[in-house]
Every structure is written in C-alpha cells, then in structure tokens.
C-alpha cells in the first residue's frame, strides 16, 4: 500500500482532462481492489476553464484494510496549457496514513517556471533518501505528466514518453510505453467494457524513496504497472482501469459508470 500515493496520481490525474474544451466539469469514481477485496474508493472532480484544469480528489481506505492501514487523502492540482504544452501550476496533498498527518505543496511560478515547495513533516532521512535540489530542474507534477500522456493517445500517437516528476516528497523519472490493444470485459458491476490501449509504466526513483524496501526498481518491467485507456466518454480515451503487480499481490483500479 506504500505505492498508493503514486498510483492515485497516475490514474486520477487523467479523467476527461485531455483535449476537449466541452468537458468543463466532470465527476468520476473509482474502486480500488486488492485480491478479491474492495479496499478503497476515489472520487474525482475535474474543472476546465479555457486552457487550465483543476482537480479535486478524495481517496479513502475501506473495509478490513482500514483496521491495518487507515488511509485518506485530499489532493488539489492545477495545470495550464501554454505554447501547446501542458505545464504544472499547483500540486497539494493533505493525507493521513495510520493516523499520521502529511502535507505537501508544490507551486510553479507561471512567469519564471521556478518552483517552491513546502512539506510537513520534513523527510526522515533515516528512512528515506534525500531529494537533491539539483534534481528539481525541469520537473513537473504527476498530474501534468499523465495529462501529457493522455493527450498523445487522443492524438493517435503512442503513449511512449519519459518525464521528470516531483510531488513534494518524491522525485522520480516516469517512463511510459504502449504495450498492446486489449478488449476489456466488465468483470465487476459498472466497470468498463470495450476496446482499450494498454500503456506500461516504469518508475525510477531519484529521491524520497525508502532506504529499506522490497521494491527493486531495476527489476521492474513495463508490464508490472498497466493503465488501460478506453473511450468512456465523448470519444475521448480515459483511464478506465489500472493494474499494479507487486510482491504483495495485485491492486486494480476500476472506473465506475453506466457504460
């Protein structure tokens, strides 16, 4: 479950954001499943005005998992389009993990593109690697990163890309690669059914990751994290499902709607 913050950013960052001006305000809902158990829910509110996008996201753990790993998070992010490129403006997260509070805020100045950030508490450098200031040049937030990816897909281009990401606590490089096209069946009530484009994701940590961890990023494959993009609304490709395979099992995210 330590991957949850990254997964949330990857999947909730993209609904309806891509290229359609007519999608001015939309709500989306996702279930989170681990094995056969529903362990959480995500609600997403997306607002678009002219060339800017704002997201408000609430995620909560649910069921038996809450007894062992109580999690909740409120995320606000905004991006804007300038010179045909989506750029970051704000990425802010208030979260609680096992009743411990975490806050992070990253702000990019629109004029000089420089960033400022604040986190509380500070990184515990006995448990995680430091984030060198020298690595923060030309970074974007996870939401803006996936907006760029989904825009490529909606322009009939492969999702292949490499991006430099910073979310306030973690600095990593994100690589995406188109794997295949796959027809999804609606294996759960209200889940998506139809053709999808499958993109694989690899994450290379550059700071903020745990010093002692079972995660070995050098052994990761693009097939370990899959995002399924389907035409769920207005002929736009949106993330309709996501699968994360790790040593502790498989976590699946499913968009919920009346398809």
Which residues does each PLM region occupy?
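Sec-dependent N-terminal signal peptides
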Residues: 4-13
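Sec/Tat signal peptide C-region and signal peptidase I cleavage site
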Residues: 15-20
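Acidic, serine/threonine-rich low-complexity disordered tracts
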Residues: 21-110, 156-259
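A charged, solvent-exposed segment within the mature domains of Sec-exported extracytoplasmic proteins
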Residues: 112-174
């Amino acid at each position: 479950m330590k991957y949850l913050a990254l997964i949330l950013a990857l999947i909730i960052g993209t609904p309806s954001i891509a290229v359609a001006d007519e999608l001015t305000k939309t709500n989306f809902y996702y279930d989170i499943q681990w094995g056969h158990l529903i362990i959480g829910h995500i609600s997403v509110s997306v607002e678009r005005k002219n060339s800017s996008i704002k997201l408000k996201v609430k995620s909560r753990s649910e069921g038996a998992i809450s007894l062992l790993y109580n999690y909740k998070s409120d995320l606000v992010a905004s991006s804007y389009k300038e010179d045909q490129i989506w750029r970051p403006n704000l990425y802010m997260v208030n979260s609680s993990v096992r009743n411990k509070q975490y806050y992070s805020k990253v702000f990019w100045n629109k004029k000089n593109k420089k960033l400022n950030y604040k986190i509380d508490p500070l990184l515990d450098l006995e448990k995680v690697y430091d984030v060198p200031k020298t690595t923060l040049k030309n970074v974007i937030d996870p939401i803006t990163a996936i907006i760029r990816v989904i825009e490529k897909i909606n322009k009939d281009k492969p999702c292949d890309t490499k991006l430099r990401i910073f979310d306030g606590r973690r600095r990593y490089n994100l690589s995406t690669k188109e794997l295949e096209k796959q027809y999804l069946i609606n294996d759960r009530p209200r889940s998506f059914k139809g053709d999808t484009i499958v993109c694989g994701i690899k994450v290379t940590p550059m700071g903020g990751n745990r010093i002692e961890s079972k995660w070995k990023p050098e052994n990761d494959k693009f097939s370990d994290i899959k995002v399924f993009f389907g035409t769920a609304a207005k002929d736009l490709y949106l993330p309709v499902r996501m699968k994360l395979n790790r040593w502790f099992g498989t976590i699946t995210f499913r968009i919920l709607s009346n398809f």
